[in-house]
């Protein structure tokens, strides 16, 4: 967390922004301080929240604890355009809890659905590559 402003650029504002957003707890790519990435704002975004807003937006999306980006997405932990809770890489058009890349569910990785899926897979707490297509518990990368 640590309310720390990383780059404070773009059109973001607030505390703990990564590239120009505001929020707390960024995790992916630019791990500096906390918050959204690219112009977005929220809580625990991954790479960027390009115009996004909410809790942990990614790249233009908004949500809670997104992984890489939530390009136009919204919700809890959106990825790349999706919305959900705790997404891994991207939720391009996805929705739900932790959608990945167009997927939906809780903590999905890349287009998966369910509870913490990785890459189109399903399980619990999967984050990204390590859960490619499968399922597991608390796997990060």
Swiss-Prot record:
Induction notes from the record: Expression in skin and hair follicle is regulated by HOXC13 and by GATA3.
Entry's transmembrane regions: none
Top-level taxon of the source organism: Eukaryota
Region: 48 X 2 AA repeats of G-[YCGS], residue numbers: 5-135
Key words of the record: Keratin, Repeat
Tissue expression per record: Strong expression in narrowly defined pattern restricted to the lower and middle cortical regions of the hair shaft in both developing and cycling hair. During hair follicle regression (catagen), expression levels decrease until expression is no longer detectable in follicles at resting stage (telogen).
InterPro entries in the record: KRTAP_type_19
One GO CC annotation: intermediate filament
Functional note: In the hair cortex, hair keratin intermediate filaments are embedded in an interfilamentous matrix, consisting of hair keratin-associated proteins (KRTAP), which are essential for the formation of a rigid and resistant hair shaft through their extensive disulfide bond cross-linking with abundant cysteine residues of hair keratins. The matrix proteins include the high-sulfur and high-glycine-tyrosine keratins.
PANTHER family referenced in this protein's UniProt entry, alphabetically: KERATIN-ASSOCIATED PROTEIN 19-3-RELATED, KERATIN-ASSOCIATED PROTEIN 19-4-RELATED
Quaternary context: Interacts with hair keratins.
Protein family per UniProt: Belongs to the KRTAP type 19 family.
Protein name listed in UniProt: Keratin-associated protein 19-2
Organism: Mus musculus
